[in-house]
Amino acid sequence: IQYQIIILPAAQKSLSKLPKKMQLRIQGAITTLASNPLPPVTKKLVGRDTYRLRTSDYRIVYEIQNNILTVTVISIGHRREVYRHN
């Protein structure tokens, strides 16, 4: 089953500000979510219906809508700051 990936504009903006090498790494991680939205390294965020995927010092925060097979990337950022904006 393939999930559709939606990246919210704020997450896309954050991604575009990162170094090119990190952008490619994060884009690769996001792409893998289409075939497996809950890889073993994913953690559910406490008190929210969102998950986080670690990529080096950066985090991808996303939610899964299983009923419509969609993964929505909410935010992308450095581990120190990504949780503050949600």
Predicted regions and their residues:
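Enriched for short, Lys/Arg-rich terminal
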Residues: 1-6, 10-24, 54-55, 63-86
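A short, surface-exposed loop/turn module that caps and links secondary-structure elements
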Residues: 29-54
